[in-house]
Amino acid sequence: MSRVAKNPVILPAGVEAKFTAAEIVVKGPLGQLAMPLNAGVEVRLEDNALKFAAKDESKASRSMSGTMRALVNNMVTGVSKGFERKLQLVGVGYRAQAQGAALNLTLGFSHPVVHPMPEGVAVETPSQTEIILKGVDKQKVGQVAAEIRAYRAPEPYKGKGVRYAGEQVVLKETKKK
């Protein structure tokens, strides 16, 4: 059995989970998330906790039981607390501005970069060099953060670019004559 799948997913107050043979739906105060269930994984609801187990002893089923448990745990956390990802803009003239369902970025290109926000991800810009992404789906929030960072990843000599909050950029030394 997967070591991750051994631990049950405890449902906090206000969060409920419903599942069929095909999918699992988790509802909470912040929203609702659904995900298809793997055919090799068995899910049981026992006293407000979801338990995962492999249906057979194949390596794929054992592996997927741990994966499903981790994904459902992220869904439960998302609908109860939500997820947040912070980005910082480092560089002269690098600015960000939230405009409705889009993010306007000035990143040293000859044109402004407009990144549309997908449904379920909210963006805030407390300052011109700070971006905060919020949502209930951890994968979606992380994907949007990675897409924004990819417009201008931190370069290795001065560290200019878009970086995650707390990210350590290793700077290279310049060439010596």
Swiss-Prot record:
GO molecular function: rRNA binding; structural constituent of ribosome
Gene Ontology cellular component terms for the protein in this record: cytosolic large ribosomal subunit
Annotated GO biological process: cytoplasmic translation
Keywords of this entry: Ribonucleoprotein, Ribosomal protein, RNA-binding, rRNA-binding
Transmembrane segments: none
Matches recorded under Gene3D superfamilies: Ribosomal protein L6, alpha-beta domain
Keyword DNA-binding found: no
SUPFAM superfamilies associated with the record: Ribosomal protein L6 (SSF56053)
Disulphide connectivity of cysteines: none
The organism's place on the tree of life at top rank: Bacteria
Family classification: Belongs to the universal ribosomal protein uL6 family.
UniProt subunit comment: Part of the 50S ribosomal subunit.
PANTHER family given in the database record: 60S/50S RIBOSOMAL PROTEIN L6/L9, LARGE RIBOSOMAL SUBUNIT PROTEIN UL6M
Function of the molecule: This protein binds to the 23S rRNA, and is important in its secondary structure. It is located near the subunit interface in the base of the L7/L12 stalk, and near the tRNA binding site of the peptidyltransferase center.
Protein name per the record: Large ribosomal subunit protein uL6
Originating species: Laribacter hongkongensis (strain HLHK9)
